Design a protein with these regions (language model features):
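Non-catalytic regulatory/linker segments of enzymes
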Residues: 1-177
């Protein structure tokens, strides 16, 4: 894995420098960090050690149980987001559509489609929530990305399922043919 866990892209990231966390948030961040660090160690993924990255990670973990829990469940996902630098920029609607369509196209059956789309959705929701909690995206950008991905997920799933239905049952016709 590349420099994500040691800071790599975060040396130039727009680092939010919040005041010290209030004690309840600091305690939550500590618990969430410990859970993530343990899961990362089990997965063989080095946890964040770079100071700038760790400060941001603590802020995000303090603000979002969803992000912290997702990262603890899948530390490789966080490493992929860090290595790919996708946390550093917004995703345009066309890019969201391409990512989701590509994931849907790889699926060979409905169960795989649903699993792969859930996995991608979690990754993208974590990315979007991270950017929001870190102060790297404003509310308008966050809502636009959530909407673009929601539209893309619904559209890609419907298109793929419809294509499978057409292939197995034929194209629906009116009673007149």
């Amino acid at each position: 894995m590349s420099g994500g866990a040691t800071g790599g892209p975060f040396k130039s990231a727009p680092i939010a420098r919040p005041a010290a966390l209030p004690p309840p948030l600091a305690a939550a961040a500590e618990r969430r960090w410990q859970r993530y660090a343990g899961a990362a160690a089990e997965a063989g993924v080095p946890p964040a050690t770079d100071g700038a990255l760790k400060r941001v990670l603590w802020r995000v973990f303090a603000c979002s149980d969803y992000v912290a829990e997702s990262c603890a469940r899948d530390p490789v996902m966080l490493q992929t987001l860090l290595d790919g630098r996708t946390l550093l920029r917004a995703c345009l609607p066309d890019e969201a559509r391409r990512r989701v369509t590509a994931a849907a196209a790889r699926a060979q059956d409905e169960a795989t489609l649903m699993r792969d789309l859930r996995r991608l959705r979690r990754r993208e929701w974590v990315r979007i929530a991270w950017r929001d909690a870190a102060g790297w995206a404003n509310a308008e950008e966050t809502m636009a990305e959530l909407s673009a991905f929601a539209d893309a997920f619904i559209g890609a799933a419907a298109e793929r399922l419809e294509a499978w239905q057409h292939a197995s049952l034929g194209t629906p016709r009116s009673p007149a043919g």
